[in-house]
Amino acid sequence: ASSLQNAIFNNAYGIPAGKLGSELLDESLEHLTNSYPHVQQIHGEKVVSISGEAGNFIVTTNKSSLQAKIVVIAIGSGNPFTIEGLESFVIPHQKAAPEKNRIQLKNTDHLVTEGIYAAGVLAGHRSQLSIAAGSGASVATDILTFWNNGNPVQVHDALGK
């Protein structure tokens, strides 16, 4: 499940105020289906292991195995990390509050190892809906953390808060 599931957006460019994260996720999947019908979406499966090498990975899920030339992992920073084959890359999250016990994959500019990339908070970034482009989003959360006296920030409102 995505962290967006519990979010509410009141000040995100192009998104109406009060939009729920759960609605945004559903609309995004519908948009992907309608705009890119040739892209296969895999629902209800969880990756349990990644093996092989760049250009010839085997991604094993709880239901099937898939072949991939490149793998992008963007599953959040929850602990424990349960994808076999990547355990040696797991480190404490460098930008999350230590008491949250979050993890990231060790990477250089998102590259974990040849052919495997981490994105979002799993790559060591802070969580933010895409309202700034490129590295500007990371810079924005760095500045917000500075303004917040060094306390890491999550940049979206949440229901019930």
Please annotate each region the language model reported:
Residues 1-4, 49, 63, 107-110:
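Short secondary-structure boundary/capping segments
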Residues 22-41:
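Helical element adjacent to the flavin cofactor pocket in flavoenzyme catalytic cores
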Residues 94-117:
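FAD-binding beta-loop-beta segment adjacent to the flavin cofactor pocket
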Residues 1-23:
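Beta1-alpha1 glycine-rich phosphate/pyrophosphate-binding loop at the start
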Residues 64, 69-102:
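Glycine-rich beta-alpha-beta "Rossmann" dinucleotide-binding loop(s) and their flanking helix/strand
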Residues 119-159:
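A conserved FAD-binding loop/helix module that cradles the flavin
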Residues 58-62, 66-67, 71-73, 116-119, ...:
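Structured catalytic cores of enzymes that bind and process phosphorylated ligands/cofactors
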Residues 42-56:
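A conserved short coil-to-beta-strand element within the FAD-binding core of flavoproteins
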